[in-house]
């Protein structure tokens, strides 16, 4: 279980429609619900649903930040807007919260809020670009589910975000940019682990942009090395899993 998720759940009870947790924490919550283990993760990646967020949510969120006593409070410039809160005073709170919003100043913070500028790293930059894509944002809203009182992106909807992030980081690396290979491997492995939670008989209605990206991912992954046994995926080959992924999504 992610450290601090219980206090987050208690504090934001009643706000389930206003956010969605994605990334490693979402994977951890979904896997835990099914009795499966997941890699250690310490940060909560939070996407605001801008159509549902109001002033009251902004105040409530900042009150949580203050109560947790986060030592570092950072904010990016531009759109999408990104906030990072880290180093709380107690492990009752998440070690880090990373919050994304497509709308500039969607959260109206109080005048006494002190936020320092935040440089964009490769993972943030990649996710920010994905969330600016209308197809992916609509897909995210479509895939929200509540698990044990917390809103997360369901596994079948989380897979395309992980796949897209993997392709984006691979493209950057091939273009000569410095990219942490651990991030590339993380997204790739998460896609395959999440398939453990998928019903192969289900079809997911998918915006055309997301559908096309998933077909590209399947095609590109055919030439990649994936140790399915090391990932704990028993009884399925890489080829079988890729076929399942390719057949999971259908254009809306």
Task: Mark where each language-model region is.
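Compositionally biased terminal segments of proteins
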Residues: 1-252
